[in-house]
UniProtKB/Swiss-Prot annotation:
It holds the Pfam family ATP-synt_C. GO terms for cellular component: plasma membrane; plasma membrane-derived chromatophore membrane; proton-transporting ATP synthase complex; proton-transporting two-sector ATPase complex, proton-transporting domain. The lineage of its organism: Bacteria, Pseudomonadati, Pseudomonadota, Alphaproteobacteria, Rhodobacterales. F(1)F(0) ATP synthase produces ATP from ADP in the presence of a proton or sodium gradient. F-type ATPases consist of two structural domains, F(1) containing the extramembraneous catalytic core and F(0) containing the membrane proton channel, linked together by a central stalk and a peripheral stalk. During catalysis, ATP synthesis in the catalytic domain of F(1) is coupled via a rotary mechanism of the central stalk subunits to proton translocation. PANTHER family: ATP SYNTHASE LIPID-BINDING PROTEIN, MITOCHONDRIAL, ATPASE PROTEIN 9. Signal peptide: none annotated. It comes from the Bacteria. InterPro entries: ATP_synth_csu_bac/chlpt, ATP_synth_F0_csu, ATP_synth_F0_csu_sf, ATPase_proteolipid_c-like_dom, F/V-ATP_Csub_sf. It is a multi-pass membrane protein. The gene is atpE. This is ATP synthase subunit c. F-type ATPases have 2 components, F(1) - the catalytic core - and F(0) - the membrane proton channel. F(1) has five subunits: alpha(3), beta(3), gamma(1), delta(1), epsilon(1). F(0) has four main subunits: a(1), b(1), b'(1) and c(10-14). The alpha and beta chains form an alternating ring which encloses part of the gamma chain. F(1) is attached to F(0) by a central stalk formed by the gamma and epsilon chains, while a peripheral stalk is formed by the delta, b and b' chains.
Amino acid sequence: MEGDIVQMGAYIGAGLACTGMGGAAVGVGHVVGNFISGALRNPSAAASQTATMFIGIAFAEALGIFSFLVALLLMFAV
């Protein structure tokens, strides 16, 4: 009985950890949307800012991957 409650808590925690993946998607959308907005205002500067955009996307996606790993650890290690 006690093991079932612990397993249920692990599944609830894994579900809550997955909300970080939604936050990563919002972050990537924000970064790319602002880049496109800036590129439309000043197309000549867009080429020099592309690398910065990809770094921002990588950081936002890293948070999503970390939350996914936490969810996997909660589901299978607890």
